[in-house]
């Protein structure tokens, strides 16, 4: 659906998971650049007020340089086909694992 929208001149705000793998991500990002369109992932935790506070505290240096980070997130996943059926390109990592990974990436770059 990302490619369909981009090929029709539409900017894309995509729900996670953005793509299933890196090669797919590179492909749609290249298409967005070629078309000069915005393509981004709608990962809600990235835009929470606490994330802005965390970024501010870290950039101020008030707590020094972080050397270790623990991040986790969990909720009940039973009965959710996108998680339980691998052929749907889901699974726990793409569905919930991305949130703590995104947090770590935001903190450590």
Segments the model singles out, each with a brief description of its role:
Residues 1-46:
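Beta-strand-loop-alpha-helix segment that lines the small-molecule cofactor/substrate pocket
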Residues 45-109:
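Predominantly a Rossmann-like dinucleotide-binding segment in NAD(P)-dependent oxidoreductases
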């Amino acid at each position: 659906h990302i490619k369909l929208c981009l090929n029709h001149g539409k900017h894309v705000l995509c729900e996670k998971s953005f793509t299933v793998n890196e090669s797919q991500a590179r492909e749609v990002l290249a298409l967005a650049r070629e078309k000069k369109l915005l393509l981004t992932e709608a990962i809600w935790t990235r835009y929470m007020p606490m994330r802005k506070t965390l970024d501010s505290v870290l950039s101020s240096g008030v707590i020094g340089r972080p050397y270790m980070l623990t991040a986790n997130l969990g909720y009940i996943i039973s009965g959710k086909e996108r998680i339980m059926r691998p052929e749907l390109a889901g699974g726990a990592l793409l569905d919930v694992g991305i949130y703590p990974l995104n947090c770590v990436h935001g903190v450590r770059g």
